[in-house]
Amino acid sequence: MKHDSFIAREGIPFIIAFGLTTLLAVFFLEQSWIAVLPLTATLFTCWFFRNPERHTPEGEKLIVSPADGKVIRIDEDFHHEMLSQPCSKVSIFMNVFNVHVNRVPYSGKVTKISYSPGRFLSANLDKASEQNERNAILVRTSDGKEIMTIQIAGLIARRIVCWVREEDVVKRGERFGMIRFGSRLEVFMPKETKILVTVGEKVKAGESPLGTF
């Protein structure tokens, strides 16, 4: 199923509910101005679940950001149990105002997806990486390299959505999921990757280069 509509489908039930509430308020309440409240909620929900087009840059070895947000940490010699070799890790914090649709950082085949239940600490805390609810997507590239993305729920975000499955072939910049309301994404890249971002830098999903190898 495609996920290229302007509004992410996960937001449709909320938009319908608020929209119907607005109509009921207009037609059945004497003080119809009250309809402004659900109307505002409807418009905010449309904005929150926006799913804009992105233009992914060219470059065979380029790894792009999986999320809109701010780079909050970079580790250039990291070990993770799901990866066979040491790696570099870039952590990105998404606030409630960012686009929440996530995109594939590099083309390849999804070899493993691992969901872990957990807590809902603020996603900008380092311990959220290990303690919060999270979903790891491991992709093997055509030349055998491993690139992994982990979706991490935050203090408010309590719904991780992942649209891809194991054995799926994915393309860099393709939409693969979303997390509602402020969260964190971490990208694990081959250790030899040249990191192209710095801590504090703002990035866009599917467009901003994170690294190249």
UniProtKB/Swiss-Prot annotation:
Catalyzes the formation of phosphatidylethanolamine (PtdEtn) from phosphatidylserine (PtdSer). The active site is at 183 (schiff-base intermediate with substrate). Its EC number is 4.1.1.65. NCBIfam families: PRK05305.1-2, PRK05305.2-5. This is Phosphatidylserine decarboxylase proenzyme. The modification Pyruvic acid (Ser) is found at residue 183. Is synthesized initially as an inactive proenzyme. Formation of the active enzyme involves a self-maturation process in which the active site pyruvoyl group is generated from an internal serine residue via an autocatalytic post-translational modification. Two non-identical subunits are generated from the proenzyme in this reaction, and the pyruvate is formed at the N-terminus of the alpha chain, which is derived from the carboxyl end of the proenzyme. It is a peripheral membrane protein. It comes from Syntrophus aciditrophicus (strain SB). Its cofactor is pyruvate. It catalyses: a 1,2-diacyl-sn-glycero-3-phospho-L-serine + H(+) = a 1,2-diacyl-sn-glycero-3-phosphoethanolamine + CO2. The record marks 182-183 as: Cleavage (non-hydrolytic). It is an enzyme of class 4 (lyase). The lineage of its organism: Bacteria, Pseudomonadati, Thermodesulfobacteriota, Syntrophia, Syntrophales. Its main location: membrane.
